[in-house]
Amino acid sequence: ACAALQDVIAEHGAPKVVIHNVAELIIKPFEEGHVDDYQSTWRSMVQSAVLLAQVTFKPMVRAGGGAFIVSGATASLRGGARFSAFASAKFALRGLTQSLAREFQPAGVHVCHTILDGIIDTERSRELHSLDRAKMMRPEDIAEAYWQLAHQPRSTWTHELDLRPASESF
């Protein structure tokens, strides 16, 4: 995957916007979990962000900057019962994003962590949850928020943003 992305960058130039939107939701009691659950969530969510940043940041810096937006979750801020594998990876992803923001902001790369505090209206989530769709986050609305983040002037960069449906308690 890294080689393919490097080839795309070599052919088309540095990306202006990169979005890391990965979640592997493992829900089970801690005592039933296995270290493989943690390795899997960390590999899919944290390691993938590290690899994506390693491939894209250097070309973005050479090109004068860009935006790198990372999708977090409620679990980025607080863990819940039965969510330890998921929450540990989302916490780590938030910390990674904060570190990258501080390191690459001076070079013109806008790094932002978004907390998606709600259930996103997808086919899979509709199969798993019996929520009213009006109470779910619409992907196109999330995309609009990401577009706005990617186009912020350097004088007012957002480094963390909470997005949630109006029906979500917080």
Predicted regions and their residues:
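Substrate-binding pocket helix/loop in short-chain dehydrogenase/reductase
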Residues: 29-30, 37-42
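Catalytic loop of short-chain dehydrogenase/reductase
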Residues: 67-92, 98, 102-105
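Active-site loop of short-chain dehydrogenase/reductase
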Residues: 14-15, 29, 60-73, 106-109
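Conserved amphipathic alpha-helix within the SDR
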Residues: 1-13
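A short, exposed helix-loop element centered on a Lys and neighboring polar residues
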Residues: 53-54, 98
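Conserved NAD(P)H cofactor-binding loop of Rossmann-fold oxidoreductase domains
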Residues: 21-27
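C-terminal helical subdomain
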Residues: 106-121, 129-170
